[in-house]
Amino acid sequence: MDISRWLERHVGVQLLRLHDAIYRGTNGRIGHRIPGAPPSLLLHTTGAKTSQPRTTSLTYARDGDAYLIVASKGGDPRSPGWYHNLKANPDVEINVGPKRFGVTAKPVQPHDPDYARLWQIVNENNANRYTNYQSRTSRPIPVVVLTRR
């Protein structure tokens, strides 16, 4: 394992957990924008198996009025839990900073004609990390379009 991958796993994950706790704990007042990082939103879903409320912070990009998130899980072979949750119930809520509102989630897969354009937007927004994540897995990484209801 190279040093950048080790740092990502052992330092980066801890920083992400801290950021997530602060962002959720302040209901979006702190954590929306961090210098040098893409903006984050809070995604509120209902557990597909448990029916329990779930919240996670994710970086996002914009495409017009839509918010774009990526189900990368850092290139893990499995999709993140939140992705399964929104597939089961696509009507979810997000916080962008302290503003919370309803959105409808639409996963976009590589076979979709708009995928390449959306992938370019999110990948450039996140310093080309998603290309690196995709190289770690054979699973196609979907882009999720969140449209305000």
From Swiss-Prot:
Binding positions (coenzyme F420-(gamma-Glu)n): 48-50, 54-59, 70-73, 81-85, 130
Primary location recorded for the protein, binned into one broad class: membrane
One GO cellular component term noted in the UniProt record for this chain: peptidoglycan-based cell wall
Enzyme's top EC category: oxidoreductase
Molecular function terms from GO: coenzyme F420 binding; oxidoreductase activity
Reported function: Involved in a F420-dependent anti-oxidant mechanism that protects M.tuberculosis against oxidative stress and bactericidal agents. Catalyzes the F420H(2)-dependent two-electron reduction of quinones to dihydroquinones, thereby preventing the formation of cytotoxic semiquinones obtained by the one-electron reduction pathway.
Name this protein carries in UniProt: F420H(2)-dependent quinone reductase Rv1261c
Organism: Mycobacterium tuberculosis (strain ATCC 25618 / H37Rv)
